[in-house]
Amino acid sequence: MDVLRTPDERFEGLADWSFAPHYTEVTDADGTALRIHHVDEGPKDQRPILLMHGEPSWAYLYRKVIAELVAKGHRVVAPDLVGFGRSDKPAKRTDYTYERHVAWMSAWLEQNDLKDIVLFCQDWGGLIGLRLVAAFPERFSAVVVSNTGLPIGVGKSEGFEAWLNFSQNTPELPVGFILNGGTARDLSDAERSAYDAPFPDESYKEGARIFPALVPITPEHASVEENKAAWAVLETFDKPFVTAFSDADPITRGGEAMFLARVPGTKNVAHTTLKGGHFVQEDSPVEIAALLDGLVAGLPQA
């Protein structure tokens, strides 16, 4: 496959973003090498807190959470999904599938050999991150899900349907504008520009374009069976599993119910509702960091 790489200068001087880039090369099943970017801040001898973003953002979404957690002494790892941020971007929309995303991030996880992970995942960060939990449950010590799900082809919310229609039909995908529309506060011009930074033009956005159409919302969608198999693993996951959905997200409202009903790790832990929109990391970063700090403090020492 043909691959685009956003020039480094696009990421210079971004607001509140001083983290050094780290890169891992993974190989697709077709032999194509793909470079995946991640942030790795804080003491390397601490258990990693893994922050996974979704559509159409990148690790920048977690910049305030990262700073808060590092100040509390934690190690924080935040990757960019393939097609986003500083990670490579396959050039064709058809290069992107749900299963390829899972395979790419599985290879990334294994190459970096992360263990004893505390995962926070939102949006597609959950659709992919929870598949990683199901594939490598021994690598994860705790999970926090926020404004996400693991769909098995049983329908969609009105909010998601509106987003799907917009994303597939708009002539240009205005990423910074989309991020601003999904937060309770107004992002600054500099913040919106940072979300636009990974995409010099529309040709870099094929991964962002196709993501909404890859969500398994009908029985005929690809990955329904794979997600059902992942649910079977999650139904045995008895380590701490916290729901932290926001109070103003029309896309995933009520999505915590399935986790609470099916994942044994949701018992005997405190759940929370965060204030904010779909991109709750922009609205409640201090609260997210405090939640993760408290969760880690309650885990047995590795």
UniProtKB/Swiss-Prot annotation:
It comes from the Bacteria. The keyword Hydrolase applies. It catalyses: 1-haloalkane + H2O = a halide anion + a primary alcohol + H(+). The keyword Hydrolase applies. Keywords: Hydrolase. Monomer. Belongs to the haloalkane dehalogenase family. Type 1 subfamily. This is Haloalkane dehalogenase. The lineage of its organism: Bacteria, Pseudomonadati, Pseudomonadota, Alphaproteobacteria, Caulobacterales. The gene is dhmA.
